[in-house]
Amino acid sequence: MEFTLRQEALVNSSWEAFNQNLPLFSVLFYTFILEKAPIAKNMFSVLKDANEIPLANPSINAHTEMVFEMVRDAAAQLQTTGQVVLGDTTLGVVHTQKRVDGLHFMVVKEALLKTIKEAVGDKWSEELSNAWEIAYDGLAVAIMKEMS
């Protein structure tokens, strides 16, 4: 299945909405993850010693921005080449060290989609959701390949 220019545009425009309030959406993103998988807290160095998700924490914002930017980049790669190649091959090592598995990728995908839904409000659609899902899945597959 081809990733279309329209899908890439949907990811880009919704990423822009997300990026307009990065501190809020960073907290939401991690809140969604921890609601679903509280044990995942120890997998994130930025949360390990925190009792709650701190608002406007530069480390949390940077990590959240990196995750969403990698999905955005995956969308661009899927549109132009049909595959995702990691720019940072150490991601496989880091995810292996943290003992990330397929279920963790699913939890993060769900949190990512919920966060984008909050960011875009009434512009949320099945088409937008599908574009982010496909891009995220492409990124997840690339990371899992590096893990093996």
UniProtKB/Swiss-Prot annotation:
A GO-annotated cellular component: cytosol
Location(s), subcellular: Cytoplasm, Cytosol; Nucleus
Binding site for heme b: 45, 95, 98
Listed GO biological process terms: nodulation; response to abscisic acid
Tissues and organs where the protein is expressed, per its UniProt entry: Accumulates in root nodules after inoculation by bacteria of the genus Rhizobium. Expressed in mycorrhizal roots in the presence of the mycorrhizal fungus Glomus fasciculatum.
Top-rank taxon, per record: Eukaryota
Post-translation changes: Nitrated in effective nodules and particularly in hypoxic conditions; this mechanism may play a protective role in the symbiosis by buffering toxic peroxynitrite NO(2)(-). Nitration level decrease during nodule senescence. Phosphorylation at Ser-45 disrupts the molecular environment of its porphyrin ring oxygen binding pocket, thus leading to a reduced oxygen consumption and to the delivery of oxygen O(2) to symbiosomes.
Oligomer status and interactors: Monomer.
PANTHER family documented for this protein: LEGHEMOGLOBIN-RELATED (PTHR22924), NON-SYMBIOTIC HEMOGLOBIN 2 (PTHR22924:SF92)
UniProt protein name: Leghemoglobin 29
